[in-house]
Amino acid sequence: MSKPLIVITGASSGFGAEIAKLFNADGFPMLLLGRRTDKIKALPLDFTNVLVESVDVTDKTSFENAITKAEEKYGKTDLLVNNAGVMLLGNVLNQDPAEWKQMMDTNVLGVLNGMQIVLPQMVERQGGTVINMSSLAGKKTFTNHAAYVASKFGVHGLSETIREEVSGKNVRISLVAPGAAETELLTHVTDESALNDYNLWKESMGGTTLAPERVAQTVKFIYDMPQTVNIREIDIAATNQ
């Protein structure tokens, strides 16, 4: 029996790349989305049943077109991993409001776009899973993270609300909230002071953060549960955080 389609956003690096490796190793057809398709195509994957599309999740039309293209080839999406995200550190007193908007658009509206695209068919066939990547910053505050924290609290709130709305149709909505991890999220930070504060905080924990592979294993664990079991949320962090 052929395996169903897995869609992963933000698949070029970090959590998304590691999630793609796990599902690829298990033989799932995949749609991998990201703005840096060259990096996705350079991943150590068997691309026989993998589509790679350049998509900005804030552009709902291109997002939907990519999913439609994949579903025409592999069937309906059974798992959407909303992994694309932006973290731009800064103090609200002086951070560029354009950075607030970028985080809200990607981290919140991008997630909603993906869910609105795939949920109608999941509800109709009474099956399917959406796993939203949030953060421990969706549960507690961190200095110089005000807008990012707001966006991730939003992901927590929308995930639980939509879970309540679709759970009666046997559709699972789950959430993974990682702590500090070794990804490329910090490469776009423009506030050097905020970045230095973050690095000092990381050093205070011994400099050890979460490996993206562990987050990928968590996503796979959630998905591999029977459809009648929904692990609503997993918070995961390095032991010393």
Which functions belong to the PLM regions below?
Residues 12-13:
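Conserved glycine-rich cofactor-binding loop
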